[in-house]
């Protein structure tokens, strides 16, 4: 029968859990070996007994560890085993003669970080030892103790250590500052681990490792990654917060432009002329006319617009709207007005890209200051109030300002005082482009006529004895400054008529056709009109000679196409009930009589005002 060992020989596992260690006595014949305790045997864990260092003065012998090993005589006999670290082996091989045995130095190093120190030990520490990671007990750090080696030597605690590759070696301190209390060492291979890494704080308070200059030069990338990993691991195991080293961002990163599109005020200090120069370089140019790439892109956009206008205005009928309720009619009318104005602006910007290069070149050569002409043109285009209108016109102004490299424009500049001749006249567009432009233009006229017809029918069905306040609101949220137009439906109607009229006049001035701007005099294309005449329509100036110079279509070809589309045997009005007006052909080819519908609308508004 074994007897219980009465002496105090608790193992590390029981001591860490503060439990009573019950160890069997091997008997009177073998007093040097210790059997494993009952708790370790029951748990199947390794029973390790480390000598209590607190009762030994520093420097008196070395600590020993008892490890249970299997032997033929004793199944779980204990043998005394001495541990030697890699650094001690290296120091022995380098000829360093320590004053104490290697295990004793290791014991002193471990006890110096957790136990009391002698005064001479504190004085022998290097200057940066105060910045080293302190090794407190796990109770002080707030962590639970490890069950197997809570009070073991540092070399056994590899779970809390940091692995560093051979490339990220730590720089060793000078020989004069070497001390047995220093814990930093250069690892011997890539798998060597250590539990304590001395860190040096820079002026910003960041924790960095003292890396050697050669390592930084040869393996800068690997060292940075290893140092970041080391500092990050220290955050999770240490009470002091080590901020992770952030990578440096090159200053050129902040100089990258953040906006590539031209919007109102989006280019900062960049002037409108510089924006036009950039657009000209992107799109390219050809001598005497727009480039082929620009024409192809415009043709593709116009084809898409034609399909969109077909869906917006082709299937709309004022007669069908009159059967709907008032609320649905107003919502549909507001949507159609919005689609019409958007279509007019997009179409105007697109055809301005096709404007011939000789217009601004001629006008600028006849004046003393060509820059003023460019400014006036930009203000003319931007007066519509749409921010996106600033994108397309800029390219056209530059196309005309920078086409001077061609032979034709150079010859024209030599004849600065002469008037424009037939040789400098722009070449007309081809037939596919002409037909696509006229198709979109016809759909826009159709949409404008549909809007006016619906407004006319709404006024005709309204009780005029109730006053203007009973008219429904066709445009929501419209105001001029602090003056709200929601309570003034008559002014809203006038705004819709005026804005649509002005946009159509600008489009006709670029195309060289006259349907609404010239009251139909001289034909739809203006071929029989006197070119020197400066008379215009009610919009003013759209039929002037300047408009003839900037047109992009052949007036005769455009007049022939429009005459075949708009002229029918039976003339009819869009909204009308005026004298001499018929029903018109609803199957297509109606003559657009927009002015008659506008006159009828204003007549109804005047009758509301008198009542």
Swiss-Prot record:
Residues in the DNA-binding region annotation: 11-47
Source domain of life: Eukaryota
GO cellular component, one term: nucleus
Keywords, sorted A to Z: DNA-binding, Metal-binding, Nucleus, Transcription, Transcription regulation, Zinc
Record-level Gene Ontology MF annotations: DNA binding; DNA-binding transcription factor activity, RNA polymerase II-specific; zinc ion binding
Subcellular location: Nucleus
SUPFAM superfamilies the UniProt entry points to: Zn2/Cys6 DNA-binding domain
Classification via PROSITE patterns: ZN2_CY6_FUNGAL_2 (PS50048)
Bias (Basic and acidic residues) ranges: 59-69
Bias kind Polar residues: ranges: 265-279
Compositionally biased region (Gly residues): 572-587
Region described as Disordered: spans on this chain: 53-128, 169-192, 265-291, 401-427, 521-550, 564-593
Sequence ranges of Low complexity compositional bias: 98-109
One Pfam family here: Zn_clus
Function: Transcription factor that specifically regulates the expression of the gene cluster that mediates the biosynthesis of the mycotoxin pyrichalasin H, a tyrosine-derived cytochalasan that inhibits the growth of rice seedlings, but also inhibits lymphocyte capping and actin polymerization and alters cell morphology. Pyrichalasin H is indicated as the responsible agent for the genus-specific pathogenicity of M.grisea toward crabgrass.
Name this protein carries in UniProt: Pyrichalasin H cluster regulator pyiR
Species annotation: Pyricularia grisea
